[in-house]
Amino acid sequence: MKFVDEATIRVEAGNGGSGCVSFRREKYVPDGGPDGGDGGDGGSVYLQADENLNTLITYQFERFHNAERGKNGRGRDCTGHGGEDLVLKVPVGTRAVDAETEETLGDLTTHGQKMLVAKGGFHGLGNTRFKSSTNRAPRQKTLGTDGEVRSLRLELMLLADVGLLGMPNAGKSTFIRSVSKAKPKVADYPFTTLVPNLGVVNPRPGQSFVIADIPGLIEGAADGAGLGVQFLKHLERCRVLLHILDIEPIDGSNPVDSARAIVGELEKHSPKLAGKPRWLVINKADLMLEEELQEKIDKVVEELAWDGEVFTISAYNREGTAELALKLLDFIDTLPPEEEVDVEAEVEFKWDNYHQNANESVNEDYDDDLDDDDYDDDDYDVEVIYQR
């Protein structure tokens, strides 16, 4: 199935049902009181993470999604049926962004996690709600409110502990093949990897971590060169980044310039991503003599002013890859657990105080219509004449 990591959809929650104005009509009860029921709440729209999905391709073709409208209230104090909620299944790791305001609504990072993205409209109130000692035959009701309407941009970001960075043909796919059972395509031309790949690494029995390989970056990627930086978002949830550097490029380019270009593109795209722990991994060590190799590595580290971890491997021959995997596992274990955010608790909607405001408004309007000079005991009873 085609890998699609971004889609724009429009979600519309159901409108609330309106309240009803109704009075009891029974034999031997000539002046029945109000019995208009409330409407039903409109259905809301939720996103739910599903570990069985791995692409957003469905939402490229199904862009409009509507929840059910609440039913109107009816006589005899019958409340309208609430609209059914709409639950949209998305892959684990999906982020929801409001396409109009660019506000991030939340991330779905665990299987079964739900997030409210469009709240259904509130139900309207029937005239039974407005009866009082001075208003025995109310003819007021409130309408149901409109449901939330949003344009959402869904962004799928892979969940991985370790992310791979590097120029095309630096050996990223070969490395992930050497430490896991993932089998991404490997060839002797640039941009062999066109979509992100995941692999599970098991350095010790019962202990593992996930590693992500993304297409190679080139200078100018932040401005759209090559495949651009559209796949860098998949590294945002990684705990540590491995900068894979080809020590002996086939085109004769300078490894230092390549490394600086990658760091520059990273900082342009996201300072937060550039600030993550980053290890330098010198690859293709088997292409040079040991004496020349160490001399060149020292020169690269010095020119880059690199003060972090440095590892030398040959992904093709699997030299040094097992030791690097163990180091990564131990480092990840020392990192603090990531905090989980309750995305639903932070969402605010504009209709939260609708009913309270509606009641206050009706009561104020009714009180203003009362005239103290004309007020007498007969005003406590209201005669209602029904005509068929």
From Swiss-Prot:
Places the protein is found: Cytoplasm
Binding site for Mg(2+): S173, T193
Biological process according to GO: ribosome biogenesis
Keyword terms, alphabetized: Cytoplasm, GTP-binding, Hydrolase, Magnesium, Metal-binding, Nucleotide-binding
Cellular component terms (Gene Ontology): cytoplasm
PROSITE patterns associated with the record: G_OBG, GTP1_OBG, OBG
Binding site for GTP: 166-173, 191-195, 213-216, 283-286, 314-316
Cofactor(s) this protein cannot do without: Mg(2+)
Domain annotation OBG-type G: ranges: 160-333
Pfam family, one: GTP1_OBG
Molecular function in Gene Ontology: GTP binding; GTPase activity; magnesium ion binding
Entry EC number(s): 3.6.5.-
Compositional bias of kind Acidic residues: 362-377
Occurrences of domain Obg (ranges): 1-159
Main function: An essential GTPase which binds GTP, GDP and possibly (p)ppGpp with moderate affinity, with high nucleotide exchange rates and a fairly low GTP hydrolysis rate. Plays a role in control of the cell cycle, stress response, ribosome biogenesis and in those bacteria that undergo differentiation, in morphogenesis control.
Subunit structure, interactors included: Monomer.
Name this polypeptide is given: GTPase Obg
